[in-house]
Amino acid sequence: MIKNITPQEAWDKLENDSDTVLLDVRTTMEFEYIGHPVGAIHVPLMEAPGWQTDPAFCEKVRETLHQSHDMAPEDLTILALCRSGARSGTAAELLTTEGFKSVYNVIEGFEGDRDENKHRGEINGWRYHGLPWEQS
């Protein structure tokens, strides 16, 4: 079962555990233009226009983490993040199935849930909570 973590809990974990990484699984366009958490590693789960899960997603995560960390990628704590927590939940399940031992889904995501006016970023999410982020 995938563990859920709030954006604030995720930031605290990142600040206090050097074996924890934040994995942003949104599309490249979202990551670059909407913004992303400072220090996040980016490996898209899917891209437009097909919007199909990348069959090489787990291997790409493994390769990316292997290049940036001294320990085995499977032994790192991974905090998966997307726009609102849905795609990152799927990513977390895939990574767990592929042998990653400690994977969390960052609920609320980067932009958060939609409010009554269908706007994101007004009720929750990484940016809403004032956590560090940047744009490319």
Which ranges hold each PLM region?
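Short, surface-exposed ligand- or partner-binding patches at beta-edge/loop junctions that are enriched
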Residues: 81
